A protein has these predicted regions:
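Terminal leader/tail segments of proteins
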Residues: 2-70, 77-147
Length: 147
């Protein structure tokens, strides 16, 4: 009889562990960032289409690292930015309307603010954006209006 009771307790403990793990997974998933929590630094217009984006350091290559968001979705976490543009982030075919790019400084490097340069392109036209992001302030954003 004692063996049956210990098996029940083990099953209950295992069930509690599994439910805790599932709860932890769902409650700690990255939620979308809210545009209202970012400081708007400007806006641009671009024709809709297959949108891509490149991000690199427009100032001194001094160890900046950032988080990059598009429409609230984290697309690059702890991205170290350098003077050469990396491969393009393919954002897909986007419809006309308002979209936004968000930048949060993780490390400002050795000189001033984190200084990402963003090029957003529809395959034919592109627009270059310089954004400043500081560690101890509200993250920065740029509105992109697709026509």
């Amino acid at each position: 009889m004692p063996q049956k009771n210990s098996n029940k307790y083990l099953l209950i403990i295992l069930l509690i562990i599994i439910l805790s793990a599932v709860g932890y997974y769902f409650f700690t998933k990255n939620k979308k960032a809210d545009f209202k929590n970012f400081t708007l630094q400007g806006q641009t217009e671009l024709n809709a289409g297959k949108i891509g984006m490149k991000v690199w350091d427009y100032s001194a290559e001094d160890g900046d690292s950032i988080q990059v968001y598009f429409d609230g979705k984290l697309i690059a976490d702890s991205l170290a930015i350098f003077n050469d543009p990396p491969s393009e982030y393919k954002l897909g075919r986007l419809s006309a309307g308002e979209h936004w790019i968000g930048v949060k400084a993780i490390n400002e490097g050795t000189m001033g603010a984190a200084s990402p340069h963003v090029r957003i392109s529809n395959g034919r036209d592109s627009f270059d954006i310089d954004i400043e992001a500081w560690i101890d302030s509200i993250p920065s954003s740029w509105k992109v209006i697709l026509k």
